[in-house]
From Swiss-Prot:
Protein name (database record): Large ribosomal subunit protein uL14
Organism of provenance: Pongo abelii
Residues recorded with modification Phosphotyrosine: Y38
Domain of life: Eukaryota
Compartments where found: Cytoplasm
One cellular-component annotation, GO: cytosolic large ribosomal subunit
Family, per entry: Belongs to the universal ribosomal protein uL14 family.
Phosphoserine, modified sites: S17
Length: 140
């Protein structure tokens, strides 16, 4: 992804275990009025025959709102995954996982639609998306 695509972020995205395939329903952790997000595609995945595209922490996905405000439902929104239940390994060797899968709705530039995030945000996501990091309550 280009620097502009991640909201002007710098630095490489390290490989992490992908725990959220297309079709997964994740919690919406911002104050936009959406309760959950249904992943319909993952940005930047080219694909392989019969393999479901999957997302991990820090990935931008295209999602629809299944529960929430009526004005958000039945539309496709870009979102960024901020937490996942599947454990992944950090460069220092520690394995980390969260108690839920969660994401936040953003625009195409990576700027958040909401103004607050409930719960922790993964450090990998905060490094890639500065606008999400600035709204995060805690970074884990």
């Amino acid at each position: 992804m280009s620097k502009r695509g991640r909201g002007g972020s710098s630095g490489a995205k390290f490989r992490i275990s992908l725990g959220l395939p297309v079709g997964a329903v994740i919690n919406c952790a911002d104050n936009t009025g959406a309760k959950n997000l249904y992943i319909i595609s993952v940005k930047g995945i080219k694909g392989q025959l019969n393999r479901l595209p999957a997302a991990g922490v820090g990935d931008m996905v295209m999602a629809t709102v299944k529960k929430g405000k009526p004005e958000l439902r039945k539309k496709v929104h870009p979102a960024v995954v901020i937490r996942q239940r599947k454990s992944y390994r950090r460069k220092d060797g520690v394995f980390l996982y969260f108690e839920d899968n969660a994401g936040v709705i953003v625009n195409n530039k990576g700027e958040m639609k909401g103004s607050a995030i409930t719960g922790p945000v993964a450090k990998e996501c905060a490094d890639l998306w500065p606008r999400i990091a600035s709204n995060a309550g805690s970074i884990a």
